[in-house]
């Protein structure tokens, strides 16, 4: 198994919606902006959002091939060092026919998500890279008035996602 390089301040991460597209819905899009701000300010990351990630529930559901395309493009982009999932859902299994395992294997990156994203973790396993079952953009990074301290601590210290940050 290939362990991707840890993230460091200034690294670019991609947000993908591999299952449910709710993060792009009018009533939830504000969580994207909260999460983006926290990922950039609290973790020092540069956030890019893949082209189809915020197109909403119906579009994302109807286009598994475009969800997979977003994932493949994120793996192909050498400037992207990590991929964080917007949220889980119920149908990421529909991406499987569109996955290129060699692309993933040849371009290892930090990959994190949970719930229905478990299917994508199996994809990473089949491609031979370590992935992380952890916080999603919509819930943990984009919820509440303040991110829970334990979420930040888990991401920074418990998961080996980040290189050492000044002793933290």
Residue ranges and their predicted role:
Residues 20-23, 87-92, 112, 117-119:
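Gly/Ser/Thr-rich loops at beta-strand to alpha-helix junctions
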Residues 1-79:
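ATP/NTP phosphate-donor binding region
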Residues 74-98:
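Long, hydrophobic/aromatic-enriched structural stretches that serve as scaffold segments
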Residues 12, 77-81, 101-107:
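Short, surface-exposed connector motifs at secondary-structure boundaries
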Residues 99-124, 130-137:
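Short, acidic/small-residue loops that bind anionic groups at enzyme active sites
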Residues 130-168:
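Conserved anion/nucleotide-ligand pocket segment
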Residues 25, 93-95, 122-123, 143:
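Short glycine-/acidic-enriched loop or helix-start segments at secondary-structure transitions
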